[in-house]
């Protein structure tokens, strides 16, 4: 191999390695900032298609209906704790330390974003409530079997997060 070809080959290999390294760093940065959407059932049992569960400490979004009678407020602070359930009746406890949206109430659809703790609770940093009686966030509607109607709470059909 003559020196000119060797120099070109070295340059091409270095360029390919550099592009691959930059692409892997970009994908790593994007992956750490992803907020994956889960229903309570998917948090407990894993995604339907892959069976993958969210990891402890992972930043996720959860969508579902606020369980009737589950909201507990701390009288001395803004801390509130409530359960979110889906169409299967599976529940996950959500804790939040800020003002809840005006439209937030039990029996309504919400999307909460936060970090999953080792106790199976979601420490929410943001809670979004649906806008009116007929609206349901698209992610929640799709995850709950494309039912664009309010789920009825059934007593006795409760599952809580256990880790």
Swiss-Prot record:
It comes from the Bacteria. One of its GO terms (biological process) is cytochrome complex assembly. Residues 30-163 are periplasmic. Residues 1-8 are cytoplasmic. Keywords: Cell inner membrane, Cell membrane, Cytochrome c-type biogenesis, Heme, Iron, Membrane, Metal-binding, Signal-anchor, Transmembrane, Transmembrane helix. The keyword Metal-binding applies. It is found in: Cell inner membrane. The keyword Cell inner membrane applies. Heme binds at residues 131, 135. Heme chaperone required for the biogenesis of c-type cytochromes. Transiently binds heme delivered by CcmC and transfers the heme to apo-cytochromes in a process facilitated by CcmF and CcmH. Belongs to the CcmE/CycJ family. This is Cytochrome c-type biogenesis protein CcmE.
